[in-house]
Amino acid sequence: MSHLFPFRQIGDFQITALSDGTMSASLDLLSGIEKADAGVIQNDAGLDEPADIHINCYLIRGRGRVILVDAGAGPLSNKGGQLNVNLAAVGISPDEVDTVLLTHCHPDHIGGLLDPEKRPVFQRAQIMLHPLEAQHWLDDKKLSMANERGQRNFGLVRQTLHAYARNLRFFDGDNIAEGILPVWLPGHTPGHTGFRIDADDKCLLIWGDIVHYPHIQSAHPNVSILFDTDPAQAEETRKKIMEKAVSKKMLIAGMHLGLAGFASIFREGSGYRLSYSEN
């Protein structure tokens, strides 16, 4: 297996962080912190583009399985859409992926499921998501209440789920494969889901979009982002899972953790600190 990208070995599974690139954003999207204070944190972290949000996908290989967690932004982002190139770099073609696990259905997570002609990219894969996620995006009442951008997102989700209708499956709380368990992490979206991989004394949690700006939201877990469907629930979930990650000494992976892909989390003051070197 290629080691061009950050990876961790948990039992029989090798988990590789594959960058999809970045998406342009703004610190104005954050609530619960002054923009200037958020900027200081980003600058102190040495980030060249402090408002950009990095996008990761994760490849899980082992026990005869090739599982992808999220599909990135695909052609929807002029600074993203690098997943397929990076899959090829580690020797994986889209047809070799047997399962795509979706943390949720925002465009930077499902955009890579369809090619520019709106055809399925992963034609042999099962697509798995939380049933509450599908219910949310297929709810006509919620669609009618959404703003223009939101309605475009609803349209994208519906188009994507329809394209994969024959291969669509829902989590039922059981292991996806022995040692891989879905973890419901609601708030960012109703069906937002992480994936826990356990083996021996090691535990890795791919926590999806618990944070978008990791340095800011670990130090200040009360900070929410405009993309959160239920900011209060997202904050509650973030605090709970960060505390659990500390107490259980989990290794963390996340779609917006940055190029390093993996981090450990520690308590610090009234919040937490992510370390990319101590894992």
Predicted feature residues:
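Residue-level marker for buried hydrophobic side chains located in beta-strands
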Residues: I67-V69, L101, I127, L204-I206, ...
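Active-site metal-binding loops of divalent metal-dependent hydrolases
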Residues: D20-G21, A71-G74, C105, E133, ...
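Histidine-centered catalytic micro-motifs
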Residues: V100-I110, L185-H192, A253-A260
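Metallo-beta-lactamase
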Residues: G81, A88-A89, Q123-W184, Q233-K249
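A short acidic, glycine-rich active-site loop
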Residues: V40-A51, G91, Q151-F154, I225-R238
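Conserved beta-strand hairpin/beta-sheet module of binuclear metal-dependent hydrolase folds
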Residues: L4-V90, G194-G208
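Cap/insert and terminal regions of metallo-dependent hydrolase folds
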Residues: D200-N279
